[in-house]
A protein has these predicted regions:
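Short helix->loop/beta-hairpin flanking segments within DNA-binding domains
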Residues: 38-74
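A short, conserved structural fragment
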Residues: 85, 90-112
Length: 147
């Protein structure tokens, strides 16, 4: 029987030919698809939100201010125009984001935001699951109160 390590070959430092200003965020959202189960158009909108957030974070250090600017009507309009969707369709997508926990308290759910060094040179991904119960998909938030 062949050793399993011979079957799986992973480069220790894979080089991705993309930048945070390019398609990186679209690939990131696609990578996280099992967690959010968004449609292609919804993933495009989320990727654009993440890209704009990253670019804003280069100049705005305060995260509360960053989130306020990101969720401002002007920024949303720019994202909608970049994605080429109508205002009505954009509102439907935003409602779904809120319902499914992608946006919580007018902020993008922190676990969906990639942790990128300020110079954009390094992205760290760390998965740690002790049991199956810790692997929670995004979805409607359930209240902890009993009726």
């Amino acid at each position: 029987m062949e050793n399993i390590t011979n079957l799986i070959r992973i480069k220790s430092n894979p080089k991705l030919k993309m930048s945070p200003d390019g398609d990186f965020f679209r690939y990131w959202v696609e990578f996280l698809r099992p967690l959010h189960e968004l449609t292609k158009r919804e993933m495009d909108v989320l990727a654009e939100f993440l890209k704009v957030r990253y670019n804003l974070s280069r100049e705005i250090i305060n995260t509360d201010r960053l989130d306020r600017v990101l969720m401002s009507e002007e920024t949303k309009r720019d994202i909608r125009q970049t994605c080429g969707i109508s205002a009505k369709h954009f509102q439907v997508i935003m409602s779904k984001f809120r319902k499914n926990g992608v946006i919580r308290n007018e902020k993008i759910f922190l676990n969906l935001i990639p942790s990128i060094d300020k110079d954009g040179a390094r992205l760290m991904i760390n998965f740690s699951f002790k049991d199956e119960q810790q692997f929670v998909k995004l979805g409607p938030q359930k209240s902890s109160q009993k009726s």
